[in-house]
Amino acid sequence: MSNKAVIILSGGMDSVTTLALAKDRGYDCYTLSFNYGQKSISELDAALYYSKKYHCIKHKVFDINFGDFTDSALTNSSTSVLDNSEASIPKTYVPMRNIIFLSIACSWAENINSTNIFIGANAIDYSGYPDCREEFLDSFEKMINLGSKTGSEGKIFNIHRPLVEMSKIRTKWIDTPGKNTKLIKPASINEVKNDD
C-alpha cells in the first residue's frame, strides 16, 4: 500500500488542519490548491507556506476560473455574502466545486500511484454546501472507484474527511495526538508572507 496522499489545500484553517492530520498519520503529502477566481486569493500564499512548513513532497496549483460561469459570492465581486437572507444554499456556494476538485485530486493520486485523498469538509460546510455532505463524499468515492484505472485494478480510492463531524470552533483547537507532527496553528496571511 502506498503511503502517499493528495491533500486538497486551500490554505484556510480546515485544509491546513487536514494536512496536519494526514502528516500525523504518516502520509507523504502532495498538496493541491486551486486558483478558481476566488476573492480570497491570498489563501494560495498560505497553502504554499504550509506545504513547505509540513515538508510536503510536492505542491501544485491548478488554474480554473469558476468566475467565468458562476455568480458565487466567492468568485464574483458584485455578489455579496450578505445577500444570502433565508436561502438554504449559501451565496458562497460554487457549483460543483468539490466534484471538480476531488476529480482532479484523484487524477493526480492515480498518476503518483496513491489511493488516498484528503479533503477538509466539516460540519458547518455540511449544513449548506451539497458537495460537503457525508452522503456526497461516500457517493463520490464509489463513483471514482468505478470509473478509474485504480478501481478497475482492484485498488480502492479512499476520500479521507477527518473534519466532517467537527465544527469550525472544534477544528480551530484540534491537536494531533500522534508523534509524527505537531499541528502548526494557521497563521494570519501577514505572518505567512513574512516567514521564510
Outline where the language-model segments fall.
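ATP-dependent adenylation/nucleotidyltransferase module used to activate substrates
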Residues: 1-177
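Cysteine-cluster motifs in flexible loop/terminal segments that predominantly coordinate metals
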Residues: 183-196
